[in-house]
UniProtKB/Swiss-Prot annotation:
Protein's UniProt name: UPF0298 protein ABC2380
Lipid biosynthesis listed as a keyword: no
Matching Pfam families: DUF2129 (PF09902)
Keyword DNA damage part of the UniProt annotation: no
Domain of life, per lineage: Bacteria
GO cellular component terms attached to this protein's record: cytoplasm
Organism: Shouchella clausii (strain KSM-K16) (Alkalihalobacillus clausii)
């Protein structure tokens, strides 16, 4: 499980042979061979610096930080439909 002070960064590369170099910036979670991108996690306080630093490398085409820590996942007033609620009670 990821602690709340971590944030994901997606880095698109020109070649996957440079993917190993990204391990020094954070915890590499996933490497896509087909689409040539790497997902890794680092401390949230270091994200702006890392985005600038990673963008300056010659093998990086694009860098995007994850917005998941800033999205509210607790919804208010979300009620299911009455018809679905009735079906759930019947076990259909």
């Amino acid at each position: 499980m990821i602690s709340p002070n971590r944030q994901g960064i997606v880095v698109w590369l020109t070649s996957l042979k440079y993917a190993r170099q990204l391990r020094r910036f954070g915890h590499v979670q996933y490497v896509s061979k087909k689409m040539k991108y790497v997902v890794f996690y680092c401390d949230q306080s270091k994200v702006p610096e890392l985005v600038d630093k990673l963008s300056s490398f010659h093998f990086v085409t694009d860098v995007k930080p994850s917005m998941r820590p800033f999205i509210n996942t607790e919804y208010e007033g979300a009620k299911p439909d009455k018809a679905k609620e009735y079906d759930y009670k019947l076990g259909i």
